[in-house]
Structure formats: C-alpha cells, structure tokens
A protein has these predicted regions:
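Short, acidic/charged, Gly/Pro-enriched secondary-structure junctions
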Residues: 1-9, 39-70, 101-114, 253-276, ...
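Phosphate-binding glycine-rich loops and adjacent basic patches that engage nucleotide phosphates
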Residues: 10, 28, 66-76, 101-110, ...
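Solvent-exposed, well-ordered amphipathic alpha-helical segments
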Residues: 1-9, 20, 67, 82, ...
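Acidic, small/polar-enriched beta strand-loop surface segments
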Residues: 1-2, 42, 56, 144, ...
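Assembly/oligomerization scaffold segments
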Residues: 1-94, 148, 156, 170-172, ...
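Charged- and aromatic-enriched interaction segments used to assemble
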Residues: 72, 77-192
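Short, functional N-terminal and low-complexity linear motifs
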Residues: 15-18, 71-80, 107-115, 199-209, ...
Length: 299
C-alpha cells in the first residue's frame, strides 16, 4: 500500500510506510474506514484528505480525515482516522420534504451530488407514489430509502459514484491453497438463530395480518421464527435474514486486491468447495505480526 496525505490547499504529501494500518469496507457500512499510525520526523501540518493505492497502483481509498494526531514521547507518531466520501451523506441532515413520483435522478441531485459525487448509476425513471423525508433523516438515509423502496436495491457510494444499479464487478476470487489465493484460515459459519421462517404483513383496509413471505430454507431446517410488519417489504426482510445466517470468513497473508461484491469461491481439502459466494466485507490490516487481508463472504 502507498499512502498520500493532502493539505487544505490540495498539496499532496507522500507519507512514510505506516507502523500500523487498518482499511475496512463492507456492504453493511455506507462509508469505508481507515486508521493508521505513521512515523513522524516533523509536523505534517494539517492533512484533510488521504489517498491509498494498492500494490498495483490502483486507488483503493480516498477519504476525508476525521482526526489527526501528532505526538512525541515513546517515538514521534502521526495518527490518522478517515472515512470515505459517503461519510458526508451520513453526517449531513436532509431537509424534510415529500417527493411525488420520485426518481433516482431527482434524489441524486438533491441529496447526493452536492457532496462531491460525480456520477449516478441506476434506473432513472420516475415511480408512482411518494417519498417522505422526515426530520432527523440523514442525506444517506433519504437516498437509501428511495433505493430500498422503489429500486429494491441497497446503494453503494464509492470513488465519487453513487451506484444503485445492482451491478457487480468483473472477476472472481478463488481461495485455494493449491493454486488459488492462499489463506491461513477459513471458517464456515451457519447462524441458524438469524433465520426468519415467515413474515406477516398488516392489511391496510382490514387490519388483519396475513402471510406475505416465507423462507423455504428456514422451514427445511425446522426453524420457526416469525415477524409481523405494519409496513415494509416482507421479501426483503426474509432475504436479509437469510444473508445474515450464512457467511464464510477467510484470512489471507499479505495484501489481496479485491472489490466489494466480487464473486468468490472457497476450496479446502477438509471443508470442500463452497460456491456462489460474493465479497461482503474486506479488511486490510498491518501490524507487528505483518500484513493480512480478511474477507467475509456471503450468498
């Protein structure tokens, strides 16, 4: 990894190799996060941005510095904590309003583009219905609410792009100690406690709750766990529960370049082949024991 700090004036400053570092991005967190400690020869002045490039010189993180610490005593150190641009959508409150026949392009122009995003991907047509942005909602919550309700998609904000297309990056990660990506450990985690067997939804006219979605996987496992909704998408709730109930973790030595949502597969002599996975979370870390990349894979 190569690290470059940026001053408020836009001047780039190459940072020395860090003593420790952690870079994490995942589908469940809108903003990617970085923390790092660097050796310090003299004060760097104010750093407001940080860029991180992987070993192929690809930009893998462009973040806003949330906290900068310079210290001496026990060694001179520069500590940085940063989040990706999506943090601006989390930190800013949306103006309460109601949209009639909302569209992705309208939501993007109002709630996302003003914070430095340059591109929007997804279905731009207008939808029947209304979207209400209530007091206290963040810009991210407003944009994500539209995507969830009308597009049935969880958006992703990265590299200046607000992506609500549902597309996945090309390529596939194959974790295999006999010819693929080497790993030090793999764990298959079945969390049966997270499954929902059925979801009932309340009728708007009669007020009666009726079955709206069922998980055949949960039923086949003998699981009975029901939820009742007054409003919301029952299928999305079932799918979300199924996704949380199964994951594979893989720890790999060194730096492993990858993209979120990339297809993945694990092959192990004892555990067998685990297919039809995708990258749900990636974490690169550097410390006293060297560097490693950890993955959470889901279906």
């Amino acid at each position: 990894m190569t690290y470059v700090g940026m001053t408020p004036e836009g001047v780039s400053i190459a940072l020395p190799p860090p003593v420790s570092a952690k870079l994490i991005c995942g589908e469940d967190a809108p903003a990617d996060g970085f923390t790092g400690v660097f050796p310090l020869l003299k004060s760097m002045g104010k750093l407001v941005r940080i860029k991180i490039y992987d070993k192929s010189r690809k930009l893998c993180f462009h973040g806003i510095v949330d906290e900068q610490k310079e210290s001496c005593g026990g060694g001179r150190k520069l500590a940085l904590a940063a989040r990706s641009r999506a943090a601006l959508l989390l930190d800013n409150e949306a103006v309460p309003q109601t949209y009639c026949m909302p569209s992705l392009s309208t939501i993007y122009e109002k709630h996302v583009k003003p914070y430095g995003f340059s591109e929007c991907r997804g279905d731009g047509r207008a939808f029947n219905g209304t979207l209400t942005v209530t007091k206290g909602m963040s810009e991210w919550q407003a944009a994500a609410a539209f995507c969830s309700r009308f597009l049935k998609i969880t958006p992703r904000a990265a590299d200046g792009v607000f992506d609500a297309s549902g597309g996945r990056p090309q390529g596939k990660l194959v974790f295999d100690n006999a010819g693929g990506i080497a790993y030090t450990s793999v764990c298959i985690d079945n969390r049966y406690c997270d499954y929902l067997s059925e979801v009932l939804v309340k009728s708007g006219t009669s007020g009666v709750y009726s079955l709206a979605a069922r998980s055949e996987t949960a039923v086949s496992l003998g699981i009975r766990r029901r939820r009742c909704l007054t409003e919301g998408d029952a299928d999305t709730l079932i799918r979300s529960a199924e996704k949380k109930a199964f994951r594979v973790t893989a720890d790999c030595p060194g730096e492993v370049p990858a993209d979120l949502f990339m297809d993945a597969e694990v092959r192990d002599a004892a555990l067998g082949a685990v297919e039809h996975l995708y990258v749900s979370q990636m974490e690169y870390s550097l410390g006293a024991n060297g560097e490693k990349t950890s993955f959470i894979l889901r279906r």
